[in-house]
Structures are given as C-alpha cells and as structure tokens.
C-alpha cells in the first residue's frame, strides 16, 4: 500500500465522507475524500505536463503552512512517483537554500510570502526548474534567473486530468519523503522514507490502540505537517482509518477551534497539553459555580462542563517528543480522555513505541509497536543502554550522505542493521521503555557518574515559578569532568498572580527563582544537583514543535 493508495481506497468506498476541514475567509469548509482525490489527480496532471518530472529520479519540495494545498500537492507529487521534501516555512533563507541544494529539488511549492526568498536563492540552485505559488496574484510568465518558471498553483489544475497520475503511479518501495532532521549536531541530513515505511509504521501503531479509531473520528491538526510526527499521526493515520482532519487556524485560536470543531483525537507535544491544562485550571478557579460544585464533592458536572469546552467528543490525546507532567495526564484522564505518550524519530517514520490505552504506566513511553524490534545496546549496571531499532519502519538512509548513513547503523553480525537512535533508555519486564536522555546530552562528573539532564529538568519544572528550563554540563577551569548547570526562565504569570496582580521586580524574581531551583534539586541525589543557575532574560529558544533547543546553550556556562 502507498500513501496515495490510502486516499484512493477511501475515496472509492466512501467518496462523500469529509476528509479535510479548514478555515477560509472566516468560514469553516470541508472537502470530501472524493473531492480531494479529484483535486490530487488534476494537480498531478499539471505538475507532470508543466515540469515533466522523472518519477523516482527527481525531488520536489513543499514550503507551506498546514492547508488543503499542502495535502493536495504532496499527494499529487508522491502519488505520481516523486519524492517530496517538506520544509519548515519558518527556516531562514540560508537553511532553506541548503536543503533545496542538498536534495537537488526540481520544483518548489510555496506561498507568496516565500516567493521573494525563492527569487533570491534560486540563482544558487542549479537543479531548480520551477516555483509553484499558492494564493495571491503573480506574473505567470516570469522566470527567475532566466530559467526557473514561476507558476500559480491553480493554473496547474487541469480539469478532468489524471493520466499522468495513473501512468506514473507510486509503488510501496518508492521514496515518498526526504525529511531533513533539525541539524542540532551539524548540518541537517535528509532521511529517505518509503511509502511502505510510513504505512507499516501506522499499521504497527494502530495494533496498540487503533481498533477504536474509525471513520467517525476527527484528528485536530495543530502541529505542522512538515514534522514527521504530525505527518504520520494526523495525515496518514486519518487516511488509514477513513477519518477526517481539521486544521486549527493558529496557535492563538487553539482553544476556540477545539470547541468549534469538536475533534476526537489530538496529536501534539506536551507543551500543547500543558497549555490546555493551564487554561482548564484557570477557568475552574474563575468559575464560582465550578468552585462550589467541587467544594461539595460534585466533580462529575464540573468535568462535563470542562469536556464540553473541549468540544465534547475528545477521546484521545497523544503526545511525543518530551515527557508530559503527571498532573496534566491525570487531568485529561479525569475527563475520560485517554492520554497516551509515545516515542519516535524521523528516521523511524517516526513512531517507535506508544503506551496502550488500557495500561497505565506513567513515565514510560510504552512497548515497541507491532512489527519491529527494539533493543538496548551497551547497557550499564543500571540497565540503561542506547535504544536501537530494526524493522520495516526504518529509513533507507540519508540522501547523498553515505558516511552519515553508515554511522547511523550498527551491524549485529548476522547481516541485520540496527538504527542507532542516540537516545538512552531502560526497559521493564513487560517491554515498556523509559527514556533516560540523549546520549550526547549526558553529563559525566569528575567521579565518572552519569547525570541525565532530562531527569534534573523534570524535577526543576515541577516548581510553578519556572516556565522554561534547560540543564547542561559545564566545565570550570581545568577541573576534570562536568558540573550540572541550569538556565531557567520565570513563569511571569505565576509571579503576577502570587503578588496580587503585580509583577515583582526583576531582582526579586531572579533571587526567588534561583532559590526555588535549588530547593527542588534537594529532592535529587547530591551528585545530580545543580551547581550553577542562570536566569535567562528571554524565553528559551525552542524548535518548531516546542522542544527547548539544547544545542543553543551548550558551552554557555563554561568558566
């Protein structure tokens, strides 16, 4: 089965079923499975006729926010045998240029906001032949650098088209996506993932909890589709089950959009769950009725009120990328929302493990999904080792980067290749995995003891006065080993609420914050405790999916 084959299956069986819900000009609209497939075929015809891309040999790129055009252009190009490079629209020009050049991209589909960028960098992209622009008014006849065609997206649409799509139909073994990793340890690398990688990954994940997901479900899409988790857990998952997707308008409207769209499944990062949890708690504190009902023990009506604020239909909340605080998970479970934590990497399509709904093991990220193998390599005396993965979900390698590919795999001596995740973990007797940290983030002190920064961060983050924290190792003079340091940013809302609505002075906040960090660290073994605390002047730098960018702070505390 291919990714486009999933769409074709449901469009053939239930063409009128809604697939994509989105906001256009202030109104919510829905496209059915049948309408989506028709659009995919017509746009594929335009891509094929206009640019004549050679299937299975040439690559395309998409630089768009979540939208029906993102879905349509991806399916149109991959469905006809091309590989697509999804790119974060927020990347800087030089980052986009590097990816487009490295991936030898022939055609870029983007919007009017990024057309100026493309006109600047196109002359340094020898493989580029076309820029397709979604929205706005453009000069259809213009060329960039005298050779790169600029084409309006709608002008590609050929009514009744589909011959190109049919003639060059994708195969399961074709590369569907080349997804570039964040490049936190160097230049980004393009992970080559086949149609079959993604399909097998979701099949394995659905064996854990998918029997309860079906055509009546609606996936709320807030994470960008260029990210492997959102791409797989929202886009492919919905097509696999014949469900629908609804796009939130923006991060500012998430709460209202959830209320209006009434989704049943939300796939996001813990930060999203934490924000919703904070909003729930704040709402309860402000509601005199809710406070009264809770005081007299009537929790049920209060939980019903809260659930209706979330649309009334929410059944699953699935997170990945970082651990979620226990109070947040328990809050959603009281609302009868099954809160699942999972783990994965881009190179693994991306889901490796997920907690089954019926088993509650807070702190773990579940057992491996069906159809793959997971092992812990080079375990220490505590049973912690590097998580390695083998199976049909693992990438084919990094595009044009054989050295990085060779480094990413370990031969087991019998011809089997294990993907080295770089993550450290332990495993219990039931196969449930607990993430201990990143191998490269590990702090080793002068006694040779290992400190996992994530463990220290999770402890510090329990302090309500802390909004952001990153724990890193630092060196001091010529002393051997590393010491534990923390960079924190205050929760200004908490300080304001705790001070009668007035924000204390910066000096007062800094002093209290440092004191609170040390108090929380007293819960840890002495060798794990923070020795230096720096209060950041700005919120910590984060990735596009909300994870603190640890590499940006490496070395900043060294003395």
Which residues are covered by each model-predicted region?
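Conserved ATP-binding/catalytic segment of the ANL
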Residues: 375, 382-445, 453, 462, ...
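Conserved C-terminal "lid"/linker of ANL adenylate-forming enzymes
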Residues: 468-473, 515-559
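Conserved pre-ATP/AMP-binding loop-to-beta segment of ANL
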Residues: 15-18, 148-151, 158-180, 187, ...
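Conserved AMP-binding/adenylate-forming core of the ANL superfamily
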Residues: 19-54, 58-67, 71-75, 92-97, ...
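Conserved AMP-binding/adenylation subdomain of ANL enzymes
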Residues: 199-218, 225-305, 313, 338
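Conserved AMP-binding A3 loop
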Residues: 30-34, 176-202
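Structural core segment of the AMP-binding/adenylate-forming
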Residues: 79-155, 482
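Conserved ATP-dependent adenylate/AMP-binding module captured primarily in the ANL superfamily
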Residues: 89-124, 201-220, 251-265
